[in-house]
Every structure is written in C-alpha cells, then in structure tokens.
Curated annotation (Swiss-Prot):
GO biological process, one term: monoatomic ion transport
Family: Belongs to the MscL family.
Topology feature Cytoplasmic, residues: 1-14, 86-130
Gene name tied to this protein: mscL
Naturally occurring in which organism (per UniProt): Bacillus subtilis (strain 168)
Subunit-level organization: Homopentamer.
Compartments, record wording: Cell membrane
Membrane topology: Multi-pass membrane protein
Keyword Transport annotated: yes
Name this protein carries in UniProt: Large-conductance mechanosensitive channel
Transmembrane segment boundaries: 15-43, 66-85
Gene Ontology molecular function terms on file: mechanosensitive monoatomic ion channel activity
Length: 130
C-alpha cells in the first residue's frame, strides 16, 4: 500500500499540481494585498476618501459587509485576468511550437517525396537498356 501511495504521489502531474496549488496560494495573497492595500485605497481616494473595507449596513442583528465583498470581487477579477493572460501566452507558445513541428514535417515530406522520385527514376533507368 505504501509503495502504491508513493508511486501515486511521485507521478509528475501530482507534483505539478501540488506546486501549482502552493504558488497559487502565494499569488492569491499577493493579489489580496495589492487590492486591499493599494488599489482600493486609491479608488476610495478618487471617490472622496471612501474606505471600502468599512462599508456595511445592518439588517436587524446581521451586519452585511458589502465593502469587503467589493474588494473580493476586485481580487477575483485581477486573478482571473492574470490567469487568462498566462493561459493565452501558453496557448500562443503551444500553437507556435505546433506550427514549427508541422513545417518541419512538411519539409521532411517534401524531401521524402523528392527521394522517392529519384528512386523511381533510378529504377526506371536500371530497367531500360542503354
């Protein structure tokens, strides 16, 4: 059982996933700090010194902190846009690599076709008497 677990845990995609989760968590903290400590205070300043983190209203005994919700939405938008940019870049690189591979295959195919024609001509010359 231990060997099975070790084989499972050491598979490349599991390790990649673990690394992605750790980096993603750290990136999330950076974005949260960016939004809470830099972007939202600047937006609040532009809106007349409004502090979004303190925006709330009470409904009976319940306190609805919609300012915190707004900050979370901004976090989400920044993270989503960042992921979009990374995926877009990776897809572009992948398409470029595939195009290069296709071009290389076409070059090999053209070369192969030329070699076949030469072979056929040589066979034809060998069969025909001089």
């Amino acid at each position: 059982m231990w060997n099975e677990f070790k084989a499972f845990a050491m598979r490349g995609n599991i390790v990649d996933l673990a690394i992605g989760v750790v980096i993603g968590g750290a990136f999330g903290k950076i974005v949260t700090s960016l939004v809470n400590d830099i972007i939202m205070p600047l937006v609040g300043l532009l809106l007349g010194g409004l502090d979004f983190s303190g925006l709330s209203f009470t409904f009976g005994d319940a306190v609805v902190k919609y300012g915190s919700f707004i900050q979370t939405i901004v976090n989400f938008l920044i993270i989503s846009f960042s992921i979009f940019i990374v995926i877009r870049t990776l897809n572009g690189l992948r398409r470029k690599k595939e195009a290069e591979e296709e071009a290389a295959e076409e070059a090999v195919d053209a070369q192969e076709e030329l070699l076949k024609e030469i072979r056929d001509l040589l066979k034809q010359q060998a069969k025909s008497p001089e």
